[in-house]
Regions:
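Active-site-proximal polar cores
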Residues: 1-30
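Short, conserved turn/kink motifs that form compact alpha/beta structural patches or helix kinks used as
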Residues: 29-121
């Protein structure tokens, strides 16, 4: 498997990040929705997918790695956020965010987020 690419040329996708938020609907009742926070360039690297059995049905899941430049905005992302690829509309449930270069000269430049499609967001 090829090593992941880093750099401006490798950031081929526009990723929109949203945070879960509670707002009042037109009747004053609390309603949970997504609040868009920011959009950044990023890369999507697919990993080996799998199928899980949920309630006696197969559910296809595709894990991916989202790579983005580290910034004050991207440092805020946690596991209760979601990412959406702007062009296709594919939604990703974020599982974790890490710095892949801890202990190297590129430490602090990039974030890799393990995420999944095909699961509830």
């Amino acid at each position: 498997m090829a090593a992941p690419e880093y750099g401006a040329g490798a950031m081929r996708y526009r990723l929109k990040f949203a945070e879960r938020d509670t707002v009042d609907d037109e009747y004053g009742n609390p309603s949970t929705g997504w609040l868009d926070r920011f959009t950044v360039a990023g890369n999507i690297t697919a990993k080996v997918g799998g199928e899980a059995v949920d309630a006696a049905r197969l559910a296809g899941r595709q894990p991916v790695i989202l790579t983005v430049r580290r910034s004050p905005d991207t440092r805020l992302v946690t596991t209760d956020w979601k990412a959406t690829e702007v062009e296709s509309g594919t939604e990703f449930n974020i599982r974790t965010a890490i710095d892949p270069f801890i202990g190297t000269s590129q430490h602090g430049l990039w974030l890799e987020m393990i995420a999944e499609t095909g699961v509830a967001v």
